Amino acid sequence: MANNTILAMNALQSNIIREITPLSDKDCFYIAERYKTEFTYPIHNHAEFELNFTEKAAGVRRIVGDSAEVISDYDLVLITGKDLEHVWEQHDCHSKEIREITIQFSSDLFFKSFINKNQFDSIRDMLEKAQKGLCFPMSAILKIYPLLDTLASEKQGFYAVIKFLTILYELSLFNEEARTLSSSSFAKIGIHSDSRRVQKLSLIHISEPTRLRCLSY
């Protein structure tokens, strides 16, 4: 069984499409709401971050990196790995009323001086965790559903951005319950230190040699 899985993953990797998304440099995000009877788009990756929601799609197989799962009626996944391939396959879904909402946004939306503020701690942690793909629990979906349900029809661009940021914040409160999908090695994620002191040292230009005693403070 393990060998079959590896062969299947290798076959998928050889067919990965590098998607050029419709996101404009002048837009904060791109959103597409689709009603469909089947999933046909092939496995792909792209540079932009993506939040993907599916409704009435029980039986669809979701593949993110080396993770493959058959989803239920509701599914919400955040992907921030720039080379992390993903696809939703029809598999065993017989629904004729599938709804899909895809939101793509650039990492540049959160410039460093902004995302590193204390108030964005939970969002920053969520975006980092989502480099391997992040699947949210039903409780999170229910929490943000009213916002997500109306985001595509929001006429005022500024309020749409505020609504989108609110969605990200509300989802970030479920960091502990959300599941990562792909393995670190497959998602090409390096091991980072959890120490905020070490992270801060890596961001600050140090004019003199750093001594070990500095880390003890």
Could you tell me what each predicted segment is?
Residues 1-78, 83-86:
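Generic protein-terminus/edge-of-domain signal
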Residues 63, 88-90, 216-217:
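Short glycine-/acidic-enriched loop or helix-start segments at secondary-structure transitions
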Residues 146-149, 199:
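Positions in alpha-helical segments
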Residues 204-217:
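Single conserved hydrophobic/aromatic residue that forms the stacking wall/gate
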Residues 48, 97-99, 161:
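A structure-centric signal for secondary-structure junctions around beta-strands
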Residues 3-12, 18-23, 80-147:
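A hydrophobic/aromatic-rich effector-binding and dimerization subdomain
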Residues 134-139, 153-203:
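Short, Lys/Arg-enriched, Trp-marked, Pro/Gly-tolerant hinge/linker segments that flank
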